[in-house]
Curated annotation (Swiss-Prot):
Biased composition (Polar residues): 74-84
Biological role: Involved in the biogenesis of the 60S ribosomal subunit. May play a part in the quality control of pre-60S particles.
Family to which the UniProt record says this protein belongs: Belongs to the eukaryotic ribosomal protein eS8 family. Ribosome biogenesis protein NSA2 subfamily.
First-listed, main subcellular location of the protein, grouped into a coarse class: nucleus
Region (Disordered): 1-34, 53-84
Designated name of the protein: Ribosome biogenesis protein nsa2
Subunit structure: Component of the pre-66S ribosomal particle. Interacts with ppp1/nop7 and nop52/rrp1. Interacts with rsa4 (via WD repeats).
Alphabetical list of PANTHER family matching this protein: RIBOSOME BIOGENESIS PROTEIN NSA2 HOMOLOG
GO terms of biological process kind: assembly of large subunit precursor of preribosome; maturation of 5.8S rRNA; maturation of LSU-rRNA
CDD domains documented for this protein: NSA2 (cd11381)
InterPro entries in the cross-refs: NSA2_fam, Ribosomal_Se8/biogenesis_NSA2
Any single GO CC term annotated in Swiss-Prot or TrEMBL for this entry: preribosome
Organism: Schizosaccharomyces pombe (strain 972 / ATCC 24843) (Fission yeast)
Extent of Basic residues compositional bias: 13-28
Length: 260
């Protein structure tokens, strides 16, 4: 037996106090008063955090109460049947029970969709243009300043060809270009180095997505054919999305979590 389970063993051997249930009930009844007293006495940042916590609890409580009310609501359809036959012009009207079922199904689908497209990092720090781009001065007397060099890691495809130097506005240094990512599969618990296919979405800006900038929170598409994943139809999965969880420009590599 583990050394820290002596209380559980004592309960199994000797049982609980004779007034255990009564003490438990009274303690639960006092919780509201204790919470009220704590809310009145607390000051500063602790008070703000506590009020925010209570607000979330109340919102959740209201949602739960609403769900119970919907479940326990009387159904008009059953009342109409008990009162008598339904008129002809009301036969095509949906019963409340059916409407409730449809509503529940729609809510469940929304929850599943939200879970499907949820990402490990829902919020990331914003990156300023000054941090993202470095101004490159050109011209004989270095007066032109319309060129920008990207200071973050980037991805460019195999078929990428640079524009002529005179017309190239955004410069992506070779040292910061990444072609592979260390992708972790959460369910399998393995990490593999997979080739990057493309950049799906950069949370900072659509321009950064177009330029293939890899920052923390960026959703990329990786080649997962090596993992041997198959669809329900038996076809091999070629590409899947993954979200970058580190700062590639600081670490020198791309670490990502596969979105399942």
């Amino acid at each position: 037996m583990p050394q820290n389970e002596y209380i559980e063993e004592s309960i199994r051997k000797h049982g609980r106090r004779f007034d255990h249930e009564e003490r438990k009930r009274k303690k639960a009844a006092r919780e509201a008063h204790d919470a009220s007293l704590y809310a009145q006495k607390t000051r500063g940042i602790k008070a703000k955090l506590y009020q925010e916590k209570r607000r979330k609890e109340k919102i959740q409580m209201k949602k739960t109460i609403k769900q119970h009310e919907e479940r326990n609501a009387t159904q008009r359809g059953s009342d109409a049947q008990t009162q008598g036959a339904v008129p002809t012009y009301l036969l095509d009207r949906e019963q409340e029970s059916q409407a409730k079922m449809l509503s529940s199904a729609v809510k469940q689908k929304r929850k599943e969709k939200a879970a499907k497209y949820s990402v490990p990092l829902p919020q990331v720090r914003g990156v300023a243009e000054e941090e993202m781009f470095k101004v490159i001065r050109t011209g004989k007397s270095k007066k032109n300043s319309w060129k920008r060099m990207i200071t973050k890691a980037t991805f460019v495809g195999d078929g990428f060809t640079r524009r002529p130097v005179k017309y190239e506005r955004f410069i992506r240094p070779m040292a910061l270009r990444q072609k592979k990512a260390n992708v972790t599969h959460k369910e399998l618990g393995v990490t593999m180095q997979l080739p990057i296919i493309g950049v799906k979405k950069n949370p900072q800006s659509p321009t950064y997505t177009q330029l293939g900038v890899l920052t923390k929170g960026t959703v990329i598409e990786v080649n997962v054919s090596e993992l041997g994943l198959v669809t329900s139809g038996g076809k091999v999965v070629w590409g899947k999305y993954a979200q970058i969880t580190n700062n590639p420009e600081l670490d020198g590599c791309v670490n990502a979590l596969l979105l399942t």
